[in-house]
Each structure stands twice: as C-alpha cells, then as structure tokens.
C-alpha cells in the first residue's frame, strides 16, 4: 500500500473504529465498514484536512471505497 494509502487507512480506522485488517482497497465505507452518510461526510473532511486539498461534492459522491479515496488523493493531495 502506498504512503497515501496508509494515511487513508489510518484515518478510516480512527474515524470508523474498525479493525485495520478490514480496511482494504475494495472495502466499501458503507457496506463493508458500517459507515453512515454522516460518517462519509466526516471522512471526506478528514481527508481534506490531512492531505491539504478540497474534495468537491461531485467527486466525494464517487468515493465509495478505500481504494477510491486513495486514487483520488494520489492525484490531488498537496501534502
């Protein structure tokens, strides 16, 4: 897993309180990790803060899995 992927995983574990081994690229925030819509908004905000970038609403709606978040942030992260 890339450095960005590891940082994404850490944020997901902290925010959702899930076991680290469950946080894999294919894991859906809602279906596999038990997030609700508020959790997903909070995750997006945490990603924005951690990586110093803005995630527009239309992009946020396409980030459904850990892998989706990692791919988006690898392209758009500032730090």
Swiss-Prot record:
GO MF entries: acyl binding; acyl carrier activity; phosphopantetheine binding
Entry-linked Pfam families: PP-binding (PF00550)
Domain Carrier: 2-77
PROSITE patterns per the UniProt record, alphabetical: CARRIER (PS50075), PHOSPHOPANTETHEINE (PS00012)
Keywords: Cytoplasm, Fatty acid biosynthesis, Fatty acid metabolism, Lipid biosynthesis, Lipid metabolism, Phosphopantetheine, Phosphoprotein
Subcellular location: Cytoplasm
Modification(s) after translation: 4'-phosphopantetheine is transferred from CoA to a specific serine of apo-ACP by AcpS. This modification is essential for activity because fatty acids are bound in thioester linkage to the sulfhydryl of the prosthetic group.
A GO CC term assigned to this protein in UniProt: membrane
Gene Ontology BP annotations: lipid A biosynthetic process
InterPro entries for this protein: ACP, ACP-like_sf, PKS_PP-bd, PP-bd_ACP, Ppantetheine_attach_site
Pathway listed: Lipid metabolism; fatty acid biosynthesis
Superkingdom assignment: Bacteria
Modified residues (O-(pantetheine 4'-phosphoryl)serine): 37
Family of the protein in this entry: Belongs to the acyl carrier protein (ACP) family.
Role noted for this protein: Carrier of the growing fatty acid chain in fatty acid biosynthesis.
HAMAP family (UniProt xref): Acyl_carrier (MF_01217)
Full protein name: Acyl carrier protein
């Amino acid at each position: 897993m890339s450095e960005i992927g590891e940082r994404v995983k850490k944020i997901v574990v902290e925010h959702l309180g899930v076991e680290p081994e469950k946080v894999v690229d294919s894991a859906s925030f809602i279906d596999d990790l038990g997030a609700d819509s508020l959790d997903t908004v909070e995750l997006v905000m945490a990603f924005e803060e951690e990586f110093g970038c803005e995630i527009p609403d239309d992009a946020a709606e396409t980030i459904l899995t850990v892998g989706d978040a990692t791919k988006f942030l690898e392209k758009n992260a500032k730090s």
